[in-house]
Amino acid sequence: MVQLNQNFINTIAQELPAHLSMDDFIAACSRPLRRSIRVNTLKISSEDFKQLMQPKGWTFDPIPWCEDGFWISYDEEEQLGNALEHIQGLFYIQEASSMLPPTALFTPNADWQCVLDLASAPGSKTTQMAALMNNQGLLVANEYSASRVKVLHANVLRMGASHCALTHFDGRVFGEYLYESFDAVLIDAPCGGEGIVRKDADALKSWSLDEVLEISETQKALIESAFLALKPGGSLVYSTCTLNRHENQGVCEYLQQTYGDAVQFESLNQLFDGAEKATTPEGFLHVWPQIYDSEGFFVAKLTKTRSVPRLQPEPKLQKNFPFTEASAKQAKAIQAYFADDLGIELPDDLIMVRDDEFWLFPHEFRDFIGKMRFQRIGVKLADHSKHGFKVRHEAIIALAGKALTAATNGAKVVDVSDEQAKEYLMGRDIPLDTAGKAQGEVIVCYGGAPLGMAKHLGNKLKNSLPRDLVKDKVLLLPPQA
């Protein structure tokens, strides 16, 4: 049973728009959320995904503000996170409202090449933006919590987002270290979480205005840092999953009061059909749960019209960056290995070397070398030894998708059944029905997307899945009559 703190109710009652009723708000907060997912178009089109899942009893109701987002219904009560297609990275379990901020940032004419996600974990919006960028340009994804950085990296890897650079800092440092470096910035700020009560019945049990005001001070510092990191002419989207004015309009107004006409609010009134139902006088989206039968959410978009002075002197460049650009000989060798042994043509990105490791970085990352420490950049391609190259799992997940549709071009692909895919993801070797000639390293594929690597020994596939990715449980969604 949802518990709404009376102080919260009293406060929200004063802020609820006149055309909405408090009874409807409380009723909406008491209803379970509709299940929603976003198709990962880095691996599969929405149409192909629907064709894949409809025989398994899924029905799809389009989310109006996300082309690849759907409310779904199906009969199974199992946890979707264990589904084979989820482990494979074909979809992300994401609440519908949380798909709004990337949609607001990536309007149809946006061509952002360098983007910052200031508070990224667990990665729903990061991977949504990676798909909108089609793994082009550079997406810097920051997360302050050390434990959540690991979750972020796992989701980036699972979804095949290859052009990300992960950082682990307090978001308040970006305006200093990466001043006016980004075409676009998303800040989905840490907040009081008033909008998620449908998912967490106790979210508002101990609500207090003092805590709200304290959080809003942190949010003001974060949005100012994000604004300083934004290039002139760039766009910033600020969002929260909370409902009070202090953490939403108040934070945006603070930024405009601080930087004057350098801050230009952009109306989101026409972002999607029906957006006007949630649009505030300033042009922000204030999504109350009863409007779209979703979580509560707030989204604001602004343009930085001119440069503003930096608050701190420019930091000195950091030394001892551990990567060097591959020589022409090294680059040719790794490209030949991927093409000849795996049937994968490496994209025209920056091939970097660290000791015996080969990595693929976005070209745009060059401008960031020495400015900040990064936890993880791009994709690790392979390790090199006297025996040759050994491909990395993450490279296959991020880069093999296009090769799998054209095995005749030389891609070494073994298609497996759903039962075999389950066995593979649980770390087991796969017996082959008929013995044949050993083929060495092959890409294991299910349903047109890669699962990972195996060694073809003629009579079986020897599993090469990294131990930390082995699953205890894999759910096969059964066909429905």
From Swiss-Prot:
Keyword rRNA processing assigned to the entry: answer is: yes
Which GO cellular component terms are attached?
Answer: cytoplasm
Q: Where in the cell is it found?
A: Cytoplasm
Recorded catalytic reaction(s): these are: cytidine(1407) in 16S rRNA + S-adenosyl-L-methionine = 5-methylcytidine(1407) in 16S rRNA + S-adenosyl-L-homocysteine + H(+)
Instruction: Spell out the catalytic residues.
Output: C241
The similarity annotation says:
Belongs to the class I-like SAM-binding methyltransferase superfamily. RsmB/NOP family.
* Physiological role: Specifically methylates the cytosine at position 1407 (m5C1407) of 16S rRNA.
Q: What is this protein called?
A: Ribosomal RNA small subunit methyltransferase F
Q: Identify the species of origin.
A: Shewanella sp. (strain MR-4)
Q: Which gene encodes it?
A: rsmF
